[in-house]
Amino acid sequence: MKVARFTKDEDLPEYGFVQEEKGKKIIAVLSGNPFAGDVDLSGERVDLSEVRLLAPNFPLKIFCCDDFMDFYLKPATCAMGPDDVLSIPDWSRGIEVRPGIGIIISTPTRNCPISEVEKHILGMTCILDSTALSDRNHVCNTAFDDSLAVGPWIETKIDPDARLTLGKEKSESIRNLLKCALKNISFISSFSTLLPGDMVAVRSQNKQIFELPGEAMAKIGGVGYLRSFVRREVP
């Protein structure tokens, strides 16, 4: 099942299930926020082409990881949705962009052993995480606004054999990234409560460097593709 967050005509964000109908994608709209409690189908159905997709979750916390216990915290203002702009800060030489997986938490998670982690997961999404290339400190280089693209939606059925692709060429299995995410969720929960909608992301070692405007794209098999437009920030 694919869970999307979207807006129609710039209205308030809504949630829905992405479904196939007569060869095209439609959204079966939900009656509320699935991270805030039980929801039902509202009965409304909209064509995917008629909405603007947003980041599929609105996290209070985003932990990004390169390896087990090697992670950093990004604020919610970093996150944006598909086809939005990844910013090159005006104080940087450019940005390094890496694809990855984002694991979305479904229930409050504290002191959770690895064997129980999957019970607290809603699903997986695709990310494009950017790091500024500058002489500033690590926090500045990773936590700046609009530095993390998330989407296109959350896939609740996680396939460990799915492949993650950066652009059109660099492809890898997500199996090791997923193992790392599960271990980090358990470890993070030992000192910080993870709440519904929070995300633990693991980045690939594949990367692209942008010093000029361009386009970044990643894809996870069975989930979907995520595209971002890279633009330099105007001071």
Predicted features and spans:
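Glycine-rich, pocket-lining loop/helix-strand segments that form or immediately flank
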Residues: 69-79, 127-144
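A short, structural micro-pattern
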Residues: 73, 97, 118-120, 144
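A generic local secondary-structure boundary/capping motif
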Residues: 52-54, 86-95, 109-116, 138-140, ...
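Short, structured patches in soluble enzyme cores that scaffold and shape functional sites
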Residues: 74-76, 99-107, 123-132, 152-154, ...
